[in-house]
Amino acid sequence: MEIFSTPKPTMDYTKFLSLPDSDNIRIKNVVKQKLLSDSDILYLLNASEDDLEPEDYFGKYVLPYYIIDNANAETHNYLCYETSFVEIPRYSEVYKVMQLIFYICINVKDVIHPQSGIPRHDLISALITRDINWSEAFGMKCKLIQDKASTTDLHYATRTLVFECELPNGISKTNMNTDESHFCNNDPDEEWW
């Protein structure tokens, strides 16, 4: 009888954090660093029951995906984000349109910031918009195309921000053995290695 063993990794996955051909992972890492270095955003998430260092917010209150555990008896404030590559601009195969989507989910019992009287999700939205709108944080200018308030069930007041940016469309390729990247010329006969 053969014994099953868990496969061993064949590479260092942290390479994807900086490779030019892994936009989804690379951009989410840039967003993570920006959010965790912004003490005002972390303050407004109001995780006061926890004594956290900035990096401890990641995976608990700052999430690189949009899933909130509604089965949890305690509701907290969350800042979720995702990337999406939705289309290629007309007449150009060299670029793709990236959407960076933020979901700011604030516990309805904690919506109003006591010192300012402004809803927390609006304040966090303003801080994110200040830093990303018309910036070149990802190499090309990002612009805000949606800013929408809503609710999810009875627990959260939310605000969704969608930023759009044109990025190079997979024109680089990295050899994972040598970590060398090169630009592709869209030649179907080109040898990759």
Give names to the regions the model predicted.
Residues 107-121:
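Short histidine-centered catalytic/ligand-binding loop motif
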Residues 47, 94-96, 115-118:
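Short acidic alpha-helical/loop segments enriched in Asp/Glu that coordinate divalent cations
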Residues 171-193:
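Protruding loop/beta-arch "assembly-hinge" segments enriched in small, turn-prone residues
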Residues 79-111:
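Active-site-adjacent structural patch at catalytic or cofactor/ligand-binding sites
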